Amino acid sequence: MAKLAEQQIHRLTIEGYASGGSGVARLEGMVVFVQGGIRGEVCDVRLTHVGRTALWGRVHEVITPSPARVVPDCPHYGRCGGCQFRHMDYAQELEAKHTRVYDALTRLGGVEHLDLPPVLGSPKVDRYRNKAQFPVSRGPRIGFYQNRTHRVVDVPDCLLQSQAAGRLRQAVKEWMTAWSVPAYDEKSRLGLVRHLYVRTNRRGEALATLVTAT
């Protein structure tokens, strides 16, 4: 078989989930972390990174879909690294999180004979986060880092964040544009604004903090 390399496509079966929400498959004895995979699916996976002991990839095409697969309701999903589960239904998301905890306690923590109860679901599956940390880059782009990178994906509205956080994000973007306030650049180490940090409460009140280079 040819040497494993980035951009190759391999047909794999998703066996489980990793701690970051990616599906887990195996190829030539190596673990493959598959972005967008659901347990039980057969997928054509495009390799995005080849490491010495593990591989990373993303779903190129789903050959045998899981009944839990849904169409993501966020237009930025797949590029934005802010969440990992919008391609599966909520019941499967809870199973994936249960697997994460079980593996951490048994495989990493060494706990034996663990009877772990199911994850309790929330009645509120959107707009439940009360803290947002938005990285800022040239443009300005204000949103979240693309998966496994420091490239900022401009996200006007995150379905997991409060609407107040989204309005503050837009206000800061307009202020930076109107006053030519520069975003911080990690490579040149020039610029000013690095992050926008927002906390909200149940009354709809919000606290915004700008993290700057100086």
Model-flagged regions — what are they?
Residues 1-214:
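Accessory RNA-recognition modules of RNA-modification enzymes
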